[in-house]
Amino acid sequence: MIIRYGVGGFLFIIMLFFFPFFAESQDKLGKINCICIDAGHGGKDPGCIGLKSYEKNIALSVALKVGKLIKTEYPDIKVVYTREKDEFIELDQRGKIANNHKADLFISIHVNAVKNKTVKGIETYVLGLHKLEANLQVAMKENAAIKYEDNYTVRYAGFDPSRPESYIIFSMMQNLYLGKSLEIAGLVQEELIKSTQKYDRSIRQAGFLVLKDVAMPAILVELGFISNPEEERFLNSLSGQNKMADAIARAFRQYKTHVEKNSVVLAPHSTEQGKDSLDKIQDSLSPGELFYAIQVASAVSVSYTHLRAHETDSYL
């Protein structure tokens, strides 16, 4: 039997599906005790496919390297992985793993691929509604992993990763962790570009299912394009993976230091203070820039160097 919903009915059902995101969100202050590192895809889901490699293998290798670096530098911090081998983990289970361990930060590691083999660069995402068509394309590709899951239409309340209208829900989500997510995204993007000298595709927003349920600051990083032969070689090289892992670990160190030193509140101290902070940020950006995360006003001081949208970027 096929059940059809009107737009209102669809949004009501999908809101019930997304409700845990709102219910579980709460401000976390102080010490970083646990980080969850998510290696994208795995098992029967290869992710993006290059000429000689799979996304799932690159993501796992870099994720394990990042975790090892963090654990070596901070033995007291619990490092949790959503997977440590080539196995398939459902998207909704990844967030649950992070939540069950009460992680303070979630980093999902991926690589990209498009038809145009000249497209290159690194981009880091936070949860939200896409502004650019290219951002939607990336989210659709990553969310398509649910099609490897049994009964995914029921499990995700009718969410279809290939339908743009399914992503309307992300415009309604007011993520209490958006400010801190932007902060770690900026640090990761900056360190990756500095370390690899790759093209800076900036910080972006899109509706990733893997990020929707995590009750903590969360980002998804696309380390490069496996469809670009030069970048595929770099992504698979030991030196390339070490550079990327080192960069992410350095970004984590800076984030940890800032959070523990300031113990800042994730949401604004007051509506006016948050609004003033966002107004100042928006005033410093040109009309074409990507920062449109007005869903939540953040009083966190953060560098927005990489919040520049490449409006002419195309994945086609």
Q: Where are the regions a protein language model picked out?
A:
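Conserved small/polar residues in nucleotide/adenosyl-binding loops
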Residues: 305-312
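Catalytic-core regions of hydrolytic enzymes
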Residues: 26-159, 174-178, 182-186, 233, ...
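Sec/Tat signal peptide C-region and signal peptidase I cleavage site
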Residues: 21-25
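Bacterial N-terminal signal peptides
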Residues: 9-18
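Pro/Ala/Gly-rich low-complexity, hydrophilic intrinsically disordered segments
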Residues: 250-292, 298-300
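Bacterial N-terminal signal peptides that target proteins for export
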Residues: 1-10
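Active-site-adjacent mobile loop/cap segments within catalytic or ligand-binding domains
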Residues: 36, 112, 166-263
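Flexible hinge/switch segments at interdomain interfaces of large molecular machines
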Residues: 156-165, 220
